[in-house]
A protein has these predicted regions:
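Radical SAM enzyme core and accessory elements
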Residues: 1-77, 81, 86-88, 365-420
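Short beta-strand motif preference
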Residues: 33-35, 126, 235-237
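Conserved acidic functional residues
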Residues: 84, 127-129, 276
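Beta-strand scaffold of nucleotide-dependent catalytic cores
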Residues: 127, 236, 304-307, 372-373, ...
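Conserved non-cysteine loop/helix-boundary elements of the Radical SAM core domain that shape
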Residues: 142-333
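A C-terminal junction/extension of Radical SAM enzymes
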Residues: 314, 318, 322-385
């Protein structure tokens, strides 16, 4: 009888094939798998004596016989670069996992660009789970402030108290980086934003402080003044697309004029700026994606992050039976970014994504985010605060996650029960 973990890996591999090609079906047996490719049936057995990678390799070779391959080969995990980093023989790694030349080059370039010039200790993450409307593609846990009133003062009070409680458990006064994410952190009122940043500024010494503004319609000069005053070094302004019609379609209310205005305003400060794009949004075609990338490159933010749409159950699109298109423009998009002086510095994969592709952050030389490098490679512990925040405790090769309550009322009620 196959182990549960083995069954999971087999399902993941077949899902990736089915996502790019019709005419594929399969049935998991007690000690193997029976599957069909365009009506040609195959049965592989003896899996109970094999490792997960050996099983996947046997299956993959059958697809290769039919001229069917995957860009990432049999690498089905979220963080393929962690396996790459551990491999002594990189070429043998490429062959073992059937990784394409293009993705192998991406791993090589990313790995070279993510080294820190200091020994990391730990970082902090603060979650602000509020948004000014919910985008149709979004599957993150957040709360729509246009549908319900929330007590931001009480929430920020609780986050600050949680940080104080954690400080009694361990010294967290000198993190490498602090990341304030969401949700849309800039969706809360400025007075509470200032209170949180003032507390951070007075109690922590850090190398990098990121504030994920996100939507242009939540940003204005008063907010940027506050961020600048309290030591924010990096902000995110995320258009997701540079197509006006798509912005309306995905319920993202800020238009391009507002985006350009906010971006120019932010350029008047000493912030590094990241901008996100999503490949696979409803109604967009090749020219839309290429045009969006070109527009961002012309704006010259310090970093550009390319996401491939992941269709999760929580998203409105998924609930409306939206189907992902297989659009692989990664080679063309990455080439344009390379030519413009951007290099990849972190990457990860998700399930249920457009063309089984990856999410990659590119930055200009020397402008990579410390937090992203640490987080994506699980280099150190990350102590997380706020509703829905997930802490990662890392001790050598051991990683343990601790999840805060997602429900805001439950979070506020239970945060004071921490063992101090």
């Amino acid at each position: 009888m196959l182990r549960e973990a083995s069954i999971k890996r087999i399902k993941e591999l077949f899902w990736e094939f089915q996502n790019i090609r019709s005419g594929i079906s399969y049935e998991i047996l007690d000690d193997g798998v029976k599957f069909s490719i365009d009506g040609k049936e195959r049965t592989l057995t003896g899996f109970d004596a094999l490792t997960n990678n050996e099983m996947k390799s046997l299956i993959y070779k059958e697809f290769l016989k039919e001229g069917i391959s995957l860009p990432w080969g049999i690498l089905t995990g979220i963080k393929p670069l962690k396996l790459y980093a551990k491999a002594d023989d990189k070429e043998a790694f490429k062959e073992k996992f059937f990784v394409s030349d293009e993705k192998f080059e991406l791993m090589e370039r990313t790995f070279k660009n993510q080294h820190l010039n200091f020994e990391p200790k730990y970082s902090l993450y603060i979650h602000i789970p509020f948004c000014k409307g919910i985008c149709s593609y979004c599957s993150f846990y957040t709360n729509d402030i246009t549908k319900k009133a929330y007590d931001f003062t009480k929430y920020i009070d609780t986050v600050i108290d949680e940080m104080k409680i954690e400080s009694k458990i361990r010294d967290i006064s000198e993190p490498d980086s602090i990341y304030i994410g969401g949700g849309t952190p800039s969706a809360i009122d400025k007075a509470n934003t200032q209170r949180l940043l003032k507390y951070i500024n007075e109690n922590y010494k850090f190398k990098e402080l990121t504030f994920e503004c996100g939507r242009a319609d939540t940003m204005e000069k008063e907010l940027l003044d506050i961020l600048d005053k309290y030591g924010v070094s990096r902000i995110c302004i995320n258009p997701q697309t540079m197509n006006e019609e798509t912005l309306k379609r995905v319920h993202r209310n800020a238009g391009l004029d507002e985006l350009y205005k906010v971006y120019e305003l932010a350029r008047g400060y000493d912030f590094d700026i990241n901008m996100d794009l999503i490949i696979g949004l409803e109604g967009e075609k090749r020219d839309d994606y290429i045009n969006s990338v070109k527009k961002l490159i012309s704006m010259r933010p310090e970093s550009i992050t390319i996401h491939n749409l992941a269709l999760k159950r929580r998203a409105v699109l998924a609930q409306n039976d939206f189907k992902l298109e297989n659009i692989d423009l990664s080679k063309e998009i990455y080439a344009g970014l390379y030519e413009a002086g951007y290099e990849p510095y972190y990457m990860y994969r998700q399930k249920m994504t457009n063309s089984n592709l990856e999410n990659v952050a590119f930055s200009l030389r020397g402008r990579a985010s410390i937090y992203n490098v640490i987080s994506m490679n699980d280099l150190t512990s990350i102590y997380a605060f706020g509703a829905g925040a997930v802490s990662k405790y890392i001790d050598k090769d051991n990683l343990e996650r601790k999840f805060n309550y997602k429900d805001i009322d439950l979070y506020i009620k239970n945060v004071y029960n921490k063992d101090i």
